Amino acid sequence: MNNQNTRLIRLPEVMNKTGYGKAWIYRLINEGLFPKPIKIGTRAIAFIESEIDEWIVSA
């Protein structure tokens, strides 16, 4: 992960990019079929945008 070019996106943007709902995204994460989120706070997560984009292309 290159910190200079890494953009973090929140779940609503991931849902918009993938067309999937929150429950389905969490199911894919739990099954190891989706990029893992990063904790950015005690109750907040984000995803690395480049990982999501790569996942979309490969899906």
Regions found by a protein language model. Name each.
Residues 2-24, 51-58:
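Polyanion-binding surface elements
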Residues 18-46:
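Major-groove DNA-recognition helix of helix-turn-helix-type DNA-binding domains
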Residues 45-46, 57-59:
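Short, structured secondary-structure boundary patches
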